[in-house]
Structure formats: C-alpha cells, structure tokens
C-alpha cells in the first residue's frame, strides 16, 4: 500500500510540475538548424518555462490547407508562416482567434493594423542567380519570361507562399496576358517544387540558372558563406512584397502561451534572429547585419490586397495550371 501511495504521489507531482507545451505549425526552413527556429525556441522556453514544439510543414499555403483539413481538431495552438496575401482566406476559415499583442514599434512597409494576425518579418520576391555563371541576368520579369537561354525553378502557388507570390507578381505585371506569360515561362522551367527549400537546394546544385526567392537571400551567402557571387536580379517593373504573419487558433489548448509567444515574437529576442536566421527583414528596429546594405533596394513594391487575392486566387491558379500543363 505504501508503495502504491508513493507511486501515486510521484505521478501527481510529475503532472503538477510538467511544463506546458506550445505547438506551432511553421515551415521547414524556419525550423532547420541553420534557420531561426532553434535559437528562438531556446529563448522562448527560457522566458515561458514551457516547451516549444515547432512542427515543420512544407510551406505557408500548405500550412493553411492542413489547418482546414484538421479544423478544430488540429494539434496546433499557433501558426507561423502564413502571409499577408492569405489573410482574408484565413479569416474566412473561422479557425483563428483575435490576438492581444501590443503592436507598438512595428514598422512594416504600408503599415499594419490587424486584430488577428501579427507580422514577424517581410521581404520582396526576386530571382536569384550566380553572377559567375550567368553574366547577363534579365533586367525585368518580362525579359526573364521571354529569354530562351534561361532555366528557372520556382515553387507551386497551391502549396507555397513564394510560389503564390510569383503568381501575384506575374498577375500584377501581365494582367489578362498572364496565361500567355505562364506558357512562355513554362518553356524554360526546370521544375515546380512544393516548397522553397527544395527549389533553392536544386538551384545550388546547379540545376537552374535562376530560382525564385527573396531580394535578401544573397545576404546568407555573403554573410554566412562569404560567397558574394549570389545575387538578386533587380527588375524594372518592381518586386512583389510579402509580409509573413503568425496567429493563434481558436481551438488552441495553450491559448495564454500562444498570446505570450505572439508578444515575444516582436521582442528583440525574436526579431534579432530574423535577418541572419530567416534572411528576411525584421518588423521592428532590430539591427541588420553588415552585408544587408549590399542587397538590392526595391523602389517599386507591388501588392494586391488580401481581399483581391481571396476573390481571385482560385481563378489565377487555374490560369497558371492550364498554361503550364498544355
């Protein structure tokens, strides 16, 4: 009997002092050992006295697709990795709860006011190339589409936020002529990948001249690898802007921890890991490492509202799919 009482007491004590676990759905490059995830996990766990479980999925659009499938039964408390183009669709899903985050100090191009989604970084889409291999990069998106000598890789707009970003970029420039542009681009497309990591890895392996990424991506090669040959091609039509966001789920089992994480997300401890971890721009005054000043400057930011994207995304994806499968 004494033994049973001791075991029971031990179990109760373990349960009483077991740390709570916050489960976050995000994308694979965020959780990678070279990404910001490991350091952010360590810093937040120290602050909250909890466990942070970062679940790596393919990419932003795929994360929203999974949440729709799981519904209120999702194991996630919070999602990190959607972007501003998906806001209206995400809200229409009814899966997300309002945040309690104080947004003072957030500095996002175009401003930010939203009661559900909190931004944590931003950037601009660009095609990356190796200047030692590609001596004359295209100076516009139209030149990239029309040049017969280029091989490119990009991501699927049905699963990837960069892939969706290219679709919006193409639409913002070509308008009703976008299907013809997609057909032309398909002639020089090596492959379309589900997510960013796969596409970028193939580019680094020499399988294409250019890959869809961000204007800030060369900072990684310059700062972490001392390889200045990787560059972002500056396009005269402008570059499409992306703001990445996080939000709490209505079904969150750890709602208070989710609120705490969202506030932590715009603190120096989180934001300082963004430039040299996620290789994007922070949404606060967090300092940029030396080397970022060499990144191209975007003078013509392009964007649609999330309502415009929600109203047209299915049709625009259908346009893309029909064009690339001809």
Enumerate the language-model features and the residues they cover.
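Short beta-strand->loop
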Residues: 97-103, 115-119, 142, 222-240, ...
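A ligand-binding cleft/hinge motif common to bilobed small-molecule-binding domains
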Residues: 85-89, 204, 208-229, 278
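Mature extracytoplasmic/periplasmic domains
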Residues: 249-304
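Extracytoplasmic ligand-binding site segments that recognize negatively charged/polar headgroups
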Residues: 21, 25-37, 58-62, 75-208
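Periplasmic-binding protein-like
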Residues: 108-109, 123, 182-186, 192-193, ...
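Short alpha-helix C-terminal cap/hinge motif
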Residues: 38-54
């Amino acid at each position: 009997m004494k033994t049973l009482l001791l075991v029971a007491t031990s179990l109760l004590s373990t349960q009483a002092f077991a740390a709570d676990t916050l489960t976050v759905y995000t994308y694979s490059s965020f959780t990678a050992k070279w990404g910001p995830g490991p350091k952010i996990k360590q810093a937040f766990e120290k602050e909250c006295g909890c466990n942070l479980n970062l679940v790596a999925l393919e990419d932003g659009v795929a994360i929203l697709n999974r949440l729709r499938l799981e519904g209120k039964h999702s194991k996630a408390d919070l999602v990190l990795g959607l972007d501003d183009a998906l806001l209206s669709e995400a809200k229409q899903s009814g899966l997300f709860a309002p945040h309690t985050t104080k947004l003072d100090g957030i500095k996002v191009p175009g401003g930010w006011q939203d009661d559900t989604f909190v931004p944590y970084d931003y950037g601009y889409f660009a095609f990356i190339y190796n200047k030692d291999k590609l001596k004359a990069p295209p100076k516009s998106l139209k030149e990239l589409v029309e040049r017969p000598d280029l091989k490119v890789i990009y991501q699927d707009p049905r699963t990837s936020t960069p892939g969706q970003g290219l679709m919006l970029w193409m639409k913002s420039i070509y308008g009703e002529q976008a299907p013809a542009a997609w057909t032309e681009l398909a002639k020089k497309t090596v492959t379309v990948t589900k997510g960013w990591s796969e596409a970028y890895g193939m580019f680094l392996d020499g399988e294409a001249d250019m890959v869809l990424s961000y204007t800030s991506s060369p900072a990684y090669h310059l700062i972490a690898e001392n390889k200045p040959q990787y560059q972002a091609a500056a396009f005269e039509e402008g570059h499409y802007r992306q703001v990445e966001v996080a939000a709490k789920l209505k079904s969150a089992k750890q709602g208070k921890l989710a609120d705490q994480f969202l506030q932590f997300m715009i603190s120096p401890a989180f934001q300082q890991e963004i430039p040299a971890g996620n290789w994007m721009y922070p949404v606060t005054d967090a300092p940029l490492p030396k080397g970022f000043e060499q990144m191209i400057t975007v003078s013509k930011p392009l964007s649609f509202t999330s309502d415009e994207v929600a109203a047209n995304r299915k049709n625009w994806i259908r346009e893309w799919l029909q064009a690339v499968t001809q």
